[in-house]
Amino acid sequence: MSVKKASFPELFDLVVVGAGHAGCEAAMASARLGLKTLLLTINADRIGHLSCNPAIGGLAKGHMVKEIDALGGMMGLWADEAGIQFRLLNTSKGPAVHSTRAQIDRDAYMKAVQRDVFRQDNLWVWQDTAENVLVENGRAAGVSTLLGQEFRSRAVCVTAGTFMSGLIHVGLTHFSGGRLGDPAAQGLSASLRAVGLELGRLKTGTTPRLLRDSINFDVMVEQPGDNPPRPFSFRSRHARMPQVPCYLTWTNEATHEAIRAGFDRSPMFTGIISGTGARYCPSIEDKIARFPDKDRHQIFIEPEGLHSPEVYPGGIPTSLPLDVQKAMIATIPGLEKAQIVRPGYAIEYDYANPTQLKPTLETKVLPGLWMAGQVNGTSGYEEAAAQGLWAALNIFCGLRGLPAFIPGRDEAYMAVLVDDLVTKGTLEPYRMFTSRAEHRLLLRENNADSRLTPAGRSLGLVDDAQWQLYTAKKTALEQLLAELDARQVRPDAATRDIFVHMNEAVPTRSVSLADLLRRPALGITDLQAFGLETDGFAADVLEEAQTIVKYSGYLKRQEELVLRTARHESVVISEAADYAAVHGLTREAVEKLSKVRPRTLGQAARISGITPAALSCIEVYLKKNGWL
């Protein structure tokens, strides 16, 4: 039911704390599903802000944007509206790992997010700082704020990003902040500890921003986008904004010398920073220290927007002193006269190790309290948005008495993300890669809709327009696959000439178009020579049909593997299980199982140190207690 926004309700269904990518995705989904939702933010002017690089997508990340979209989420639509360059990455490899990445106009993206957030029925916004999670009768019951407000709710979702006790470092100068220009949330960490959560400390960083007009692009390598650009959303026909290039330059030995000269004033090397940094997004000073033999590092000059005076030099995040940053920049080809508009900096912040969460992202220690996004130890906009949507769907299911939304690792990258987090935890910022998904052949960007849109529809987040697009594509794909299987090509004189012209062996018997498509050198459009009409099919339908046919053998083996492992995934472990009472388990196994409290035997198997023998012991215990 839609509720127009008048005065604030006395009782919200959900309070979302933080309006970054996790918070906006969670709040929009919750409100669209009919839950009365409050989005609480430290700065309403920065709702949906891209705090680091002006880009969305990338390897495995593009898959998650597509999955968010397939479920009815928003990130793909917002990215398509603000995208100023789109590229499909990994095209030299198989289609399973092709990933979309878009440069984003930072202001246009934020405006799109804020427009939808402020217009959305059932969704209220309040600028303030969350100080405490309210608890009543052993459940989260709302939040209180720095301004003394209390917002009562049936559920709370903390999506605080880097804001919990955030500490910013530029050289040996450090000060409180959630990001440069915004205050930190100082009280929330203590409140979360008070309800029983254990918090750790992580670190991330960003690059200095440069004045566009002070850069010499002529000595750099231009990096154009794809033409035509391919949007993220299954609901988008095309990109909306003019497309612009990026540029590539490199560091050199003079750059590295300038950086080394500042090591003695680096907060990372002097021990001032205690938080663990991102392994896969290291600072430039870390790269120089760890790889002294490498004579240069790439720097991608990324536009901040069509009309922005700033650019983002991707590849040189740093927390070195400002004078060192200036000296470093001045040695880079094309940046000799570049002016720094904003310094690069590192930020430390509190996070909750996600083994303290259920697979729904609800905390184990306090019912009604959910956590999503960077506060769970992840890095990246896309990982955050995926968690925000996941949490919102499960909050909706919980409040409505529906089964939890927990797809398997063979169904979604976001499922791999959440399962890794709640099962293994993380002591460093977690980033998604295609290599983390053991069933990645089944998890292609192009089939995200067939994997997840029916689930989004059944939950109520996929609207009629999106459902019609999905069913039309599904019908067209089924029609095309049927035609490829049914239509036969005979080795007669006419077809023989076609095969010879294509440099292909002539078959000795009649073969289907699908059989021909399995030949490595032939693509689906080549089959037009044999009478296949492709003009009536959209490009994504043709591409998906080609993938399904060409990789049918591999896909079948992958599906068989999923079936073989499905038995463990279907064995649910009772919440009442006492691992100390399981005969045959080692002390290590008891400790890890008691901490994670896996939902299924399959999840238990993915905990480090849990052997097949331990799984057998658990299964015997479950049967003995009548839980199997």
Swiss-Prot record:
Residues reported to bind NAD(+): 277-291
PROSITE patterns: GIDA_1
Transmembrane in keyword set: no
GO molecular function, one term: flavin adenine dinucleotide binding
Keywords: Cytoplasm, FAD, Flavoprotein, NAD, tRNA processing
Coiled-coil segments: none
Sites where the protein binds FAD: 18-23
Cofactor: FAD
InterPro entries in alphabetical order: FAD/NAD-bd_sf (IPR036188), GIDA_C_N (IPR049312), MnmG (IPR004416), MnmG-rel (IPR002218), MnmG-rel_CS (IPR020595), MnmG_C (IPR026904), MnmG_C_subdom (IPR047001), MnmG_C_subdom_sf (IPR044920)
GO CC terms: cytosol
Localization (cell): Cytoplasm
SMART domains the record matches: GIDA_assoc_3 (SM01228)
GO BP annotation list: tRNA methylation; tRNA wobble uridine modification
UniProt keyword Cytoplasm present: yes
Main location: cytoplasm
Gene3D superfamilies assigned: FAD/NAD(P)-binding domain, GidA associated domain, C-terminal subdomain, tRNA uridine 5-carboxymethylaminomethyl modification enzyme MnmG/GidA
Subunit structure: Homodimer. Heterotetramer of two MnmE and two MnmG subunits.
Family indicated by similarity: Belongs to the MnmG family.
Function in brief: NAD-binding protein involved in the addition of a carboxymethylaminomethyl (cmnm) group at the wobble position (U34) of certain tRNAs, forming tRNA-cmnm(5)s(2)U34.
Record PANTHER family: GLUCOSE INHIBITED DIVISION PROTEIN A, PROTEIN MTO1 HOMOLOG, MITOCHONDRIAL
Protein name: tRNA uridine 5-carboxymethylaminomethyl modification enzyme MnmG
Annotated organism of origin: Oleidesulfovibrio alaskensis (strain ATCC BAA-1058 / DSM 17464 / G20) (Desulfovibrio alaskensis)
